[in-house]
C-alpha cells in the first residue's frame, strides 16, 4: 500500500489546474534513459515518463494544463525528472539498460496501450 502513495499524491497534484505555461514551451523528450538514471541517482529525484500521442486531446490537455506548469516550477526547484515519449514515433531511445530502441517499441515493451500514461520510476527504471 505504501508503494502507491507517491503516484497517488502526484495524480492528485496533477488534478488541480495550475494555469498555462508559456505557449510553445516543449517538455523534455526522452533520449537516453541511462543518462537520466545517473542524474536521478545523484539528485535523488524520481523519473516521470509521460507517454503520449500527438493525436490525443487528453494528452494535450494534461500537457498544457498540468505538466508544462509543473515543469516550469520544477526547473526552479527540481522535484522530478520529466521525460516524454511519443508512442507513435520511431525516434531513437537508449533504455535504462543501455539497449537501443525507439519510442513506439519502448512504449509497447512497457505495456503502454492507452495514452496519456504517466510512469513514475526510480533510478534503475523500477516502478515507484
Report each predicted region and the residues it spans.
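Bacterial N-terminal signal peptides
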Residues: 7-17
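N-terminal "domain-start" segment that seeds a small globular fold
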Residues: 20-39
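Short active-site neighborhood of thiol/selenol oxidoreductases, capturing the structured segment around
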Residues: 43-56
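Loop/turn elements at helix/coil->beta-strand transitions in domains of secreted/extracellular proteins
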Residues: 44-47, 78-81, 114-115
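Solvent-exposed loop/turn segments at secondary-structure junctions
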Residues: 54-58, 66, 87-92, 125-127
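Typically the conserved alpha-helix immediately C-terminal to a functionally engaged Cys/Sec
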Residues: 60-75
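Thiol-based oxidoreductase modules, predominantly thioredoxin-like and allied folds used
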Residues: 75-100
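A short, hydrophobic beta-strand/beta-hairpin element that forms part of a small beta-sheet core
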Residues: 114-128
Amino acid at each position: 500500500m505504501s508503494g502507491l502513495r507517491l503516484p497517488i499524491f502526484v495524480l492528485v497534484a496533477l488534478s488541480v489546474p495550475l494555469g498555462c505555461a508559456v505557449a510553445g514551451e516543449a517538455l523534455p523528450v526522452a533520449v537516453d534513459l541511462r543518462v537520466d538514471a545517473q542524474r536521478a541517482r545523484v539528485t535523488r529525484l524520481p523519473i516521470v515518463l509521460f507517454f503520449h500521442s500527438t493525436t490525443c486531446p487528453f494528452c494535450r490537455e494534461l500537457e498544457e494544463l498540468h505538466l508544462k506548469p509543473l515543469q516550469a516550477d520544477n526547473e526552479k526547484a527540481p522535484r522530478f525528472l520529466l521525460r516524454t515519449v511519443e508512442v507513435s514515433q520511431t525516434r531513437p531511445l537508449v533504455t535504462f539498460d543501455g539497449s537501443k530502441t525507439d519510442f513506439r517499441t519502448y512504449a509497447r515493451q512497457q505495456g503502454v496501450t492507452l495514452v496519456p500514461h504517466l510512469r513514475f520510476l526510480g533510478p534503475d527504471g523500477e516502478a515507484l
